[in-house]
Amino acid sequence: VKENIKGSFLGGDTRASGYGYYTWQADPEQTVSGAISEDKAWETYYHSILICNITLDNIGDISGSKAEKEDLKAEAYALRAYCYFMLVNLYGQPYNQATAETDLGVPVNDVVGMEDRKFVRESVAEIYRQIESDLKEAITCFKASNLTKTCFRWNLPATYLLASRVSLYKKEYDKAIEYATYVIAAQPQLYDLSAMSDDDYFLNEKNPEILFTYGYYLVSYYAWLAKCNFPISDDLQALYGDNDWRLTHFFYKRRAVYTAQKSETSGTTGIYGYAFRTAEAYLNRAEAYAGKGDKDKALQDLKTIREKRLKVYEEVQAVTKEDVIRRVREERRRELSFEFHRWFDLRRWDRPRIEHTFTPDIKQPDVVEKYVLEKDDPAF
């Protein structure tokens, strides 16, 4: 299993800006010059957690109907759960039931103001308990409010989707299936890519599978503004093949290479940002079925997706449990590429060996440095 991008210096090399991430440095914010840039993810997620804490602490003092207050509480709990989920998977160890109680996760911020206090890292298990508690509260509050929501606000189906993802990461397959099934029952339709115009972005207002959308679609500064430096990898491109609409609808071909383009990078009317999608619910459920050894149900969920993605439908060939698991992982890679899933999936699956090459000086293209992330490396 490989990753989804490869290095290139077509159009000038800006990979030096993302040097720390691209070359597996101990401090990923390190630039090629040795300077340390700011870690925006840590700041952004913990700031959001603080706002959620303040909201929940003051919910009794705000005006509004009981239903509106329950809905606001639900949104705060759901957002806080998502922030902790991202933080623990960015900075903590991958979830492993055997070691989760001692593996280091991230701090829990339970304050609503300034305190002279040193926060300590909680265990991975404790962070997942925090996430699950918040999701349970969010689901309860959303059901109590029963308000009609748009895809621009946290809502009940999106919360169930996150719950299915969390359960899948923990290999609690029955729960993952239960939560994913709720999502599919609430919003089963997938975007038929055969009807998608070449002028459209995939994440647009006509896409019926978007449960919740937020922000702008920044694959990353490096992968967007420097597309030619981060085209999709050869093996990812081969995984789609010419029969798959996703190759041309998820990516843009330039100078003989494909780059990610599921959405726009700015606020364009009718074009959405990051999204929670029904397709993930089918994939979460398929992976859970595969993990339980329920081959037929896993393949049925893959079929549902592939019927809307292939020009001519092809059956998935799988005989053993291992075959089914491999096919589910391949489909997940195709469908969810460049949507904040791949790195987390590599961490929780098999943590493979990954090799990157870096060209320090584009005027000397034959001078290449090689950087390797070994299998099961602690850097995962």
Question: How would you name each of these model-derived features?
Answer:
Residues 158-170:
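Hydrophobic/aromatic-rich effector regions of fungal transcription factors
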Residues 48-55, 83, 134, 162, ...:
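Amphipathic, well-ordered alpha-helical segments in soluble domains
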Residues 1-72, 84-126, 146-152, 160, ...:
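Short acidic-aromatic linear motifs embedded in glycine-rich loops, typified by GG[WY][YF]DAGD(H)
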Residues 295-308:
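Active/binding-pocket-proximal capping segment
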